Structures are given as C-alpha cells and as structure tokens.
C-alpha cells in the first residue's frame, strides 16, 4: 500500500493508478492534480497540474494506446484533458459545455475509441469523442433533472453475430446516478447517434452519490449504487436483456452516508466508502449472497 501524506493543501477527492500501476494521479479541493511515480511502496511527486478554478473531484487515465493522457473534472464546470510528452505535462483540450459542477469523468472501454463520459450538476451528461485529427465531437443531453452525481461505463460487449452473414453489433452502455434518487441505464443507438434511457431503477430514498458498473465480462452484469440514504444496492442483469434485480447489502453495516463504490479489476470484489471514514469490501458467495470481505486498513 502506498501512503501519500501532505501532498495537497486541502481534501483529496480521488486517487487513481494508471494502467500499469506505475503512475498515481490525485486531485483535491486545492484546485490541483498531483502526479506521482510509484515503485513498490515508495512514491515520488513528479508534477503538479494547475488549470482548474475550483475543487477537482475526479481524475481518470485513458488507455495507454492513446498515450499518457489524464482527464479531470471540477466544480468549475470544466473537464480538462492533460497529456505527458517528454516528461512534461500540458493541457491538450478543455471540455466546457456544462453550466455547473462536473462531478464525474470516465474514459470508455478503449474498444470504442477515445470517448469520455462526464456527469454534471446541471442535470446533463456529455459524451465527447476525441478523433485522431484533433477534433472533438460532444453529445450532451438531459439525464437527471436535479443533477447527475456519477456515471460509469459498462465493459465492452457485442451482441448478435450468431447467424451466417450476421456481424456482431457493438453494445455501448453506461449507468448514471442522480439527485432525483434514480439510477438510469443508457444505451447508444447507432442509427440516431444518440444515447437513450434503457432502464430506470428505483431503489434509493435520497441522492445517489456513486454508481459503478463491474468490469467483469461475464454474461451477468453487475452495477453498484450507493446513496445519501446509507444504502448500497447491487443490481444484476442476465445476458444484457433481462430485468434488473436489486439486492441490498446488509443495511446495519453502514452507519453513515455512502460516497463511493469501486470494483476490483476482476469485477468480483466491491469496495465501498462512506462518512464513517471506513472502506469495506464485499464479495458474492457461491450461493449468490453478498457478504463482507473485510475492511481496508487505513
């Protein structure tokens, strides 16, 4: 475990390792992003990225096939794309289509290209496609009327292609969580070149603070949603087409607001953090029941 002490002058909101686990990006209410090189349990600060005018909520690394690229989102309503070349970091794009805080940012599975998903307190979600010629094409649309707190891509999947002469079709989906207490599943329609609501999931009685789609590419899909109401729901769907089934984790385990949910790389362990300053781990047993798998020692 790498411990970063006194790196920022205010609260740290996110910390993400790159694809290889060699670089760590952190972001803070001090309006900066810090880049560290990580080796074993040691780390070295290599750069401080300055460009946002408000607290920076989240950061996300692009797949290395696109280069050493990082996206950040902030209370200032902007998403900034940063790139490292020759050991120097610089801004290469600013995505400023939102009119309020951008609360979540995530790159799509690399199979879809350089697609970036952003969620904002203005009630809208945007998906930006960055093309090789340097242009960017944004789609922006209403998602949750009171505000969107989080968004998460589904892993890359295809459907069809089972019959002779039939090509498999790419399935692009993501999930959003909002201040309207709802979780929504979105699916890309290539004919209209737009994202449409596929399902609306009701299961929380207060703001949905985070959503996380498991990266597992099994036939069953898993989504975790955590809320201001102190609950975590696991939503499951069989084979991309069936109804979503809700399982609520043991409620007495969570004495305070839940802020974040994060899956392991294999998609079988879920980490949840909340207002009690604990990170708890959860795993599905062979009987399909979710049980505690311990805590992360701080």
Curated annotation (Swiss-Prot):
A UniProt-annotated Pfam family: WD40
Domain of life: Eukaryota
Membrane topology, as annotated: Peripheral membrane protein
WD repeats: 7-46, 51-92, 97-138, 143-196, 203-245, 253-292
GO cellular component, one term: endoplasmic reticulum membrane
Alphabetical keyword list: Cytoplasmic vesicle, Endoplasmic reticulum, ER-Golgi transport, Membrane, mRNA transport, Nuclear pore complex, Nucleus, Protein transport, Repeat, Translocation, Transport, WD repeat
GO biological process: COPII-coated vesicle budding; ERAD pathway; mRNA transport; nuclear pore localization; positive regulation of DNA-templated transcription; positive regulation of ER to Golgi vesicle-mediated transport; positive regulation of protein exit from endoplasmic reticulum; positive regulation of TORC1 signaling
Ranges in a coiled coil: none
Localization in the cell: Cytoplasmic vesicle, COPII-coated vesicle membrane; Endoplasmic reticulum membrane; Nucleus, Nuclear pore complex
GO function term, MF aspect, one: structural molecule activity
Quaternary state and interactors: The COPII coat is composed of at least 5 proteins: the SEC23/24 complex, the SEC13/31 complex, and the protein SAR1. Component of the nuclear pore complex (NPC). NPC constitutes the exclusive means of nucleocytoplasmic transport. NPCs allow the passive diffusion of ions and small molecules and the active, nuclear transport receptor-mediated bidirectional transport of macromolecules such as proteins, RNAs, ribonucleoparticles (RNPs), and ribosomal subunits across the nuclear envelope. Due to its 8-fold rotational symmetry, all subunits are present with 8 copies or multiples thereof.
Role summary: Component of the coat protein complex II (COPII) which promotes the formation of transport vesicles from the endoplasmic reticulum (ER). The coat has two main functions, the physical deformation of the endoplasmic reticulum membrane into vesicles and the selection of cargo molecules. It also functions as a component of the nuclear pore complex (NPC). NPC components, collectively referred to as nucleoporins (NUPs), can play the role of both NPC structural components and of docking or interaction partners for transiently associated nuclear transport factors.
Protein name: Protein transport protein SEC13-1
Organism whose genome encodes this protein: Candida glabrata (strain ATCC 2001 / BCRC 20586 / JCM 3761 / NBRC 0622 / NRRL Y-65 / CBS 138) (Yeast)
